[in-house]
Amino acid sequence: VSTVLSRGIETPPPYTNLRAAAEWEEIEALTIAWQGYPCILKQIVAASISECRVIVFTENPSSTINYLLGNSCGGSIDLDNVDVVEQELNTIWIRDYGANTVYGSWNDDRILVDWMYNRPRPEDDVVSDALGEHLGIDVYSTTAAPYNLMNTGGNYMSDGFGTAFESELVHDENNGESTWWTTYPNHTPTEIEDIFEVFMGIDTL
């Protein structure tokens, strides 16, 4: 068990041909935040282990392992392709706060890119750092000016060729205004696009 003491590298990755992975590309590992809905999560693990490695973040590894090996919700699961990692969590929604896979050169030099999460959930916001530590992959974080960027995975889709799709929420949550729990980063739309480009190789947003 390790404790994440800092966020990732807060400067752009040192590559000139960055490529953000597409939503539909083959994956090496599926990440799950074990927080509520245990029966559904167990079924996701069972359906995924024949396709890829499954990494389960949980606050109580022994309890999670016992549940995965138990008879409920489909029966015992073979854990040979499952990593159970102890990590503090706030919520289940790892799609929104998890890391983004980016390559420095097409399919090589893999890194992870992590944005500021758009919710007041500090444990969730550092899960990407825990993933990078577990896999031995560098994490680049948009958490420090002038590259501080707030975003959520549910508002992002990439095609793997330099184009990404976002709603205007990314503008609203980076306009420098205040909300009940934080003050947003302050960027123009052009500055937002520049951050996506230098961290993820996105040239069309």
Predicted regions and their residues:
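The feature marks the mature, well-folded catalytic cores of soluble enzymes
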Residues: S2-L205
